[in-house]
């Protein structure tokens, strides 16, 4: 979505809001894989009340993916696939002194997979805003729809922490650590080996 510019040269949207629409196309040779993606994103800053951002996505994938099997064997070398994924993400952030706390909710669905997510994070500014400490966690509650079987659950938990330091106007140094755990159905339906 593009900002509307009235005849007087101003914009109809406040400078604290931003919206955009994007399209991506990935196409491999021999029609092996084709991925089309549409994204609608927005961000609005409400001053002391915090800020809100969102994203809607629609991905379509078609083609064939290698299974890991040897060519000419009993198992097929390629697995044909066609799927559409729709997802939405919303996040609210609020500044509390030197802390910026954010909560993010997400949901996406495709033919054989549903994902529900919750993320919480905090960024602390120190040293006249030259140093930022960040930490947070991410929880995913997924459902995998397995052909000829009951739906399977998959859960993921990630914790991250990091620090960034402004050295000068052209240099920022950062270090980050992420630790993740997965539980439940972890199989890939497109691999046979």
Where would I find each of the regions flagged by the language model?
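Short glycine/proline- and aromatic-enriched beta-strand/turn motifs that initiate or cap beta-hairpins
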Residues: 8-46, 50-53
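Transmembrane beta-strands of outer-membrane beta-barrel pores
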Residues: 23-29, 58-62, 96-98, 107-111, ...
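Outer-membrane beta-barrel translocator domains and adjoining extracellular loop/strand segments
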Residues: 31-36, 55, 65-71, 113-121, ...
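Transmembrane beta-barrel outer-membrane domains
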Residues: 31-35, 79-85, 111-115, 126-128, ...
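Hydrophobic, lipid-facing positions within transmembrane beta-strands of outer-membrane proteins
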Residues: 36-40, 86-90, 116-120, 155-161
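Solenoidal tandem-repeat scaffolds enriched in leucines and small polar residues
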Residues: 141-193
């Amino acid at each position: 979505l593009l900002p509307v510019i009235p005849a007087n040269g101003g914009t109809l949207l406040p400078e604290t809001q931003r919206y955009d629409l994007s399209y991506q196309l990935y196409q491999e040779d021999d029609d092996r894989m084709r991925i089309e993606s549409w994204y609608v994103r927005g961000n609005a800053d409400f001053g002391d009340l915090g800020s809100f951002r969102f994203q809607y996505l629609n991905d379509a994938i078609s083609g064939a993916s290698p299974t890991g099997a040897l060519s000419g064997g009993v198992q097929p070398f390629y697995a044909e696939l066609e799927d559409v994924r729709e997802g939405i993400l919303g996040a609210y952030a609020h500044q509390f002194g030197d802390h910026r706390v954010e909560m993010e909710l997400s949901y996406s669905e495709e033919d054989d997979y549903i994902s529900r997510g919750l993320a919480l994070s905090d960024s602390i500014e120190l040293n006249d805003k030259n140093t930022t400490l960040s930490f947070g966690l991410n929880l995913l509650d997924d459902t995998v729809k397995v052909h000829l079987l009951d739906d399977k659950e998959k859960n993921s938990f990630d914790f991250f922490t990091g620090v960034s330091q402004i050295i000068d106007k052209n240099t920022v140094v950062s270090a980050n650590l992420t630790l993740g755990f997965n539980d439940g159905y972890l199989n890939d339906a497109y691999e046979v080996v």
